[in-house]
A protein has these predicted regions:
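Generic hydrophobic alpha-helical scaffold/packing signal
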Residues: 208, 234, 256-259, 266, ...
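"…together with the soluble PPM/PP2C metallo-phosphatase catalytic core" -> "…together
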Residues: 1-262
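Alpha-helical transmembrane segments of integral membrane proteins
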Residues: 292-310, 316-319
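Membrane-interface capping segments at transmembrane-helix boundaries
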Residues: 28-31, 340-355
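Long, low-complexity, intrinsically disordered cytosolic termini of multi-pass membrane proteins
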Residues: 297, 349-379
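Extracellular/periplasmic helix-loop-helix junctions in multi-pass membrane proteins
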Residues: 313-331
Length: 379
């Protein structure tokens, strides 16, 4: 594993600049949050804090990130980077308004799609996916007209997935920093200068805010920060990961963002199995499970940091090792995921899902019998 030494200086400066600006801006943003009433008041059992805490910390992260980008990334003749930053500004403005007055979910979703379309229509798009079937003669799936909708789905999905894991002090911020650091390492290995500097700025901005966000948190980053981090991670992963053609390239971004992706997927499946809306808020996320298993907030967050770090390290191995080693690693990770799911999803939940499926099956049988009776009566 070798890094491009010429990139180390700008990467280090970008990281340090974002860290300092983010750290210094947080008290300023905290004061602003109190003035505009952007305060998170615990109102239900999903909240893990017991006293009002100011939101809008994402503004400090955004300030640190932008300061570093404007200093170390030349965006003047770079329409792709311009489109990413424009979309990010829309996401941040949306987040600020939502943190202050709580916007309707449908409106937020529509605006997120608009923000995602900006980079998707300006070259930041998933053009092809590697075929996971290693026995197929076609190594890649060229998306053609599906490129834009799949790109928008990816960006909006990751944007919301990061927001959904923002349930414990420092969790989403730390996991995002680990994910960004992973992309940074891969970009350094592949000599992708722009991606490396942008990810360094994101890591620095996250780390600068982290002292205020770790348990017990003095400030939350709110939707402003969580959706911004998800947006940047999703768009930059397209720039730095999806465009590399390799048999296992489809797995790399999913590993790097594995924690928010799998937690969100399991949450939606669980809710639909219980007859609820996929967007219905509940206390079934992985961080809630760990708390219910007896861990305190710091232990739960540390556990998820380790999991995210292992996934990130696996992604680096996938990009640097041979294809045979990569496939073996993927198989091993799948086995670990199955075992972990049995631990994280306790017996009671499995029984609930089983009962729900039985009820649906019985309902189907009753409807079939009623239909048969109607048919016989007509005869």
């Amino acid at each position: 594993m070798r890094f491009d030494n010429q990139l180390m200086a700008p990467v280090a400066l970008a990281l340090l600049t974002a860290l300092v600006v983010s750290f210094l801006m947080t008290p300023v943003v905290k004061s602003f949050a109190y003035k505009v009433g952007a305060i998170d008041v615990p109102k239900d059992e999903r909240r893990m804090h017991h006293k009002p805490i100011p939101r809008l910390g994402g503004l400090a992260i955004f300030a640190g990130f932008m300061a570093s980008i404007l200093l170390f990334v030349d965006i003047r003749l770079n329409p792709q980077m311009q489109s990413i930053l424009l979309g990010a500004v829309i996401i941040v403005v949306l987040g600020v308004v939502d943190d202050i007055m709580a916007l309707p979910a449908k409106l937020k979703f529509v605006i997120q799609i608009v923000a995602a379309l900006i980079p998707a229509l300006n070259g930041v798009s998933i053009q092809a996916l590697s075929n996971p079937n290693i026995f197929s003669p076609n190594a890649y799936w060229v998306l053609n007209w599906l490129s834009v909708p799949i790109t928008v789905l990816w960006i909006v999905g990751i944007t919301n997935a990061v927001n959904l894991i923002d349930g414990l002090d420092g969790l989403a911020n730390g996991v995002s920093a680990i994910s960004a650091a992973t992309v940074l390492v891969i970009a350094l290995i592949c000599s992708e200068a722009q991606v490396a500097v942008v990810m360094a700025a994101l890591v620095g901005a996250c780390v600068g805010f982290l002292p205020y966000n770790l348990n017990p948190a003095k400030m939350f980053m709110g939707d402003t920060g969580a959706t911004f981090l998800g947006f940047i991670l999703s768009t930059m992963s397209i720039q730095g990961l999806f465009k590399f053609y390799a048999v296992i390239s489809f797995a790399v971004p999913f590993l790097i963002l594995g924690l928010p992706i799998f937690d969100t997927a399991f949450a939606m499946i669980r809710r639909m199995a219980h007859g609820q809306s996929p967007m219905h808020a509940d206390r079934g996320h992985i961080h809630h499970r760990l708390i219910d298993m007896g861990l305190n907030q710091k232990q739960a967050v540390a556990t998820l940091y380790v999991i995210s770090g292992i996934l990130g390290l696996s992604a680096v191995v996938l990009t640097t090792g041979g294809e045979a080693k990569a496939m073996l690693l993927l198989i091993a990770l799948c086995v670990v995921a199955v075992v972990a799911a049995r631990v994280v999803f306790p017996k009671e939940v499995k029984e609930e899902l089983h009962e729900e499926l039985e009820e649906l099956t019985e309902l189907g049988h009753h409807e079939e019998k009623d239909k048969q009776k109607e048919d016989s009566s007509h005869e």
